[in-house]
Amino acid sequence: MKTLLLTLVVMTIVCLDLGYTLICFISSHDSVTCAPGENVCFLKSWCDAWCGSRGKKLSFGCAATCPRVNPGIDIECCSTDNCNPHPKLRP
């Protein structure tokens, strides 16, 4: 009986997800599971020389904290799964 109980306890621990992992977009359609300690999804946008004809450049990803904002760069941060979609694909 003790062996059965021990086996059930071990299986429960193995099957449980003991830590929450965040999922963030890394491109318009692809997402990844963030590394431990990366608790924020971000979407960074900025203009380059072709901004008028091609639109803003975009960078997606995971981070431990929201990246610093520099002049001319817009950053949006969030902390739920896939919360950083491409601006044109938002509901």
From Swiss-Prot:
InterPro entries: Snake_3FTx, Snake_toxin-like_sf, Snake_toxin_con_site, Toxin_cobra-type. Pfam families: Toxin_cobra-type. SUPFAM superfamilies: Snake toxin-like (SSF57302). Keywords: Acetylcholine receptor inhibiting toxin, Disulfide bond, Ion channel impairing toxin, Neurotoxin, Postsynaptic neurotoxin, Secreted, Signal, Toxin. Expressed by the venom gland. The keyword Heme does not apply. It is found in: Secreted. Disulfide bonds join 24-41, 34-62, 47-51, 66-77, 78-83. One of its GO terms (cellular component) is extracellular region. GO terms for molecular function: acetylcholine receptor inhibitor activity; ion channel regulator activity; toxin activity. Residues 1-21 form the signal peptide. The keyword Secreted applies. PROSITE patterns: SNAKE_TOXIN. Binds with high affinity to muscular (alpha-1/CHRNA1) and neuronal (alpha-7/CHRNA7) nicotinic acetylcholine receptor (nAChR) and inhibits acetylcholine from binding to the receptor, thereby impairing neuromuscular and neuronal transmission. Belongs to the three-finger toxin family. Long-chain subfamily. Type II alpha-neurotoxin sub-subfamily. This is Long neurotoxin LNTX28.
